Amino acid sequence: MGLLDGKVALITGGARGMGAAHVRLFLEEGARVVFGDVLDDEGKALAEETGAVYVRHDVTSAREWERAVALATDLYGKLDVLVNNAGILKYRRIHEMSPADFDQVIGVNLKGSWLGIKSVIDPMKAAGRGAVVNISSIEGFIGAEGLSAYSASKFGLRGITKSAARELARHKIRVNSVHPGAIDTAMVMNPDLVNEVDAETFVKSMVIKRFAKPVEVSHVVAFLASDRASYCTGSEFTVDGGLLTGAGY
């Protein structure tokens, strides 16, 4: 019996990287999965490979949220789980970053997740319960040079998580956040970021001295989506190899 048997899940940003790992693990654990992205070629390929259902989904669009949620409920009759995984990173120092770039990061990472929570309330109420997992970051706890917009969005997502947890508990909807650290994905390996960071020194500063595989985050996400996390809401789960334990000296 899988951890997520009988669950219907909607996962954003699911075409590659950590999102694709979530899609694969949720399927392995028995969930039926609809996943969205704006990367159509990769999304369609993953759907063909796994049997999950792909939908083009710009998370900044309320209309596209309505469409994605409707697809899941029309196909499977309910919606139990939302994983707000979609996110973008732009490495720019404050004096180099345009207002448009700042707005884009906040729009995808913060507003997109808020729209997602708003969009799933009614179907989760109808189902009698639900679970939302917001993918934040260790940058939701600390600042980093060149990541002002990204850090702001991830700090903000912590606040949305806690507010939503308080609002939605009466409907048996749990809301938690996951905070990955150094994960081996295309976004983390962004050339602008990699060129600014000495990877060897960075790894030496870790307690667990390696980058994580995306599926190592997915296992935490799946737990929070499952009934085994029935008493967890408004909580923050770090998957960071000990990066936030201290300064490393």
Q: Which sequence ranges carry the predicted segments?
A:
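Alpha-helical segment proximal to the catalytic Tyr-Lys
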Residues: 122, 166-170, 230
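Substrate-binding pocket helix/loop in short-chain dehydrogenase/reductase
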Residues: 93-94, 101-106, 202
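Active-site helix of classical SDR
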Residues: 117, 153, 161
